[in-house]
Amino acid sequence: MDLSNLKPAEGATQAGQRLGRGEGSGRGGHSSTRGTKGQSSRSGSGTRPIWFEGGQTPLFQRVPKHGFNNAPFRTDYAIANVKRLQRLLDEEVLDEDEPVTPEVLADLGVVRTANRVKILGDGDLFDALEVKAHAFSESARQKIKQAGGSVTVVDQ
């Protein structure tokens, strides 16, 4: 006994109606159970997309175009907050004497990639750090400098 031997129980299935195979079949000839004329009698009259409005000009064409989308040219940054840098210092993962670069942050798993890194100013920083990144928020700049550190913007 295997899957190829399995069959449905007697009477459990019904053969589908063979339409359009001549008048003698009882379901054939001219209109084949579809009624007479109209959209639903034609081929391809199945379910239409949800936005189809029956031939009326659809809403998205009636409403004027609006706005601008710069998505293809957007600059995406991997972000790290100063509180994360402070936590790494507290856990002695980072060394105060070594500069913090995008490569260091990527190696530690703070950011996924070192390609473009932006430092944001959430949290507090108490130790002086030399931080190098592609971009800094204004608050991050202030907090790093207040702690006695330095900020360097590296090229893309």
Swiss-Prot record:
SUPFAM superfamilies: Ribosomal proteins L15p and L18e (SSF52080). Residues 1-56 are annotated as: Disordered. Pfam families: Ribosomal_L27A. InterPro entries: Ribosomal_uL15, Ribosomal_uL15/eL18, Ribosomal_uL15/eL18_sf, Ribosomal_uL15_bac-type, Ribosomal_uL15_CS. GO terms for cellular component: cytosolic large ribosomal subunit. The keyword 4Fe-4S does not apply. GO terms for biological process: translation. One of its GO terms (molecular function) is structural constituent of ribosome. The keyword Ribosomal protein applies. Keywords: Ribonucleoprotein, Ribosomal protein, RNA-binding, rRNA-binding. Belongs to the universal ribosomal protein uL15 family. Part of the 50S ribosomal subunit. Binds to the 23S rRNA. This is Large ribosomal subunit protein uL15. It comes from Salinibacter ruber (strain DSM 13855 / M31). The gene is rplO.
